[in-house]
C-alpha cells in the first residue's frame, strides 16, 4: 500500500549531496532521516541536541501520523537514542522534522553532516471517544500490570 505524503525540501543538499528519504527494501517500515548539519558535532555523555533534517512533511490525512524512531545500530553500538524516545508527527503539522538526539552512552559521539540518525515511519491513527462508566466488565487480567502476567 502506498500513500502520498507532501514533502518539502528545506536544505538544498538533499537530493544532491544526500538522498531523499527512501525505503531500503520492499519490507522496510521506515525511511532514514539524516543530520543536516553544517559541521560535525560532538555529544558528550548525557548531552541532548536538536538536529535538523532539512525536511518538512504534511501528511494531511487525519487517519495517519508519522513517528520518528531511533536507528537500532546507533543505540546499541554507541548509546545514541532519541531524547524524547519517540517523536510523534501529527497529520496537520507542517514544520521541519527535527530529531532530539541523546547520548546515553559512556563515551563522546561525533555526529557527521548527512549521517543517518533516525527513521520515519508512517502509521495509522484511531481517534477514540471515551464512554464514562462506573465499573468495567471484569477481564481475565483485571488490574494486574508491571510483570503480573509472568516472564515465560
Swiss-Prot record:
Disulfide bonds: none annotated. Substrate binds at residues 71-73, 84, 88-90, 98. GO terms for biological process: dUMP biosynthetic process; dUTP catabolic process. Pathway: Pyrimidine metabolism; dUMP biosynthesis; dUMP from dCTP (dUTP route): step 2/2. Its EC number is 3.6.1.23. The keyword Transit peptide does not apply. It is an enzyme of class 3 (hydrolase). GO terms for molecular function: dUTP diphosphatase activity; magnesium ion binding. Its cofactor is Mg(2+). It holds the Pfam family dUTPase. It comes from the Bacteria. InterPro entries: dUTPase, dUTPase-like, dUTPase-like_sf, dUTPase_trimeric. The keyword Calcium does not apply. Keywords: Hydrolase, Magnesium, Metal-binding, Nucleotide metabolism. It catalyses: dUTP + H2O = dUMP + diphosphate + H(+). Belongs to the dUTPase family. PANTHER family: DEOXYURIDINE 5'-TRIPHOSPHATE NUCLEOTIDOHYDROLASE. This enzyme is involved in nucleotide metabolism: it produces dUMP, the immediate precursor of thymidine nucleotides and it decreases the intracellular concentration of dUTP so that uracil cannot be incorporated into DNA. This is Deoxyuridine 5'-triphosphate nucleotidohydrolase.
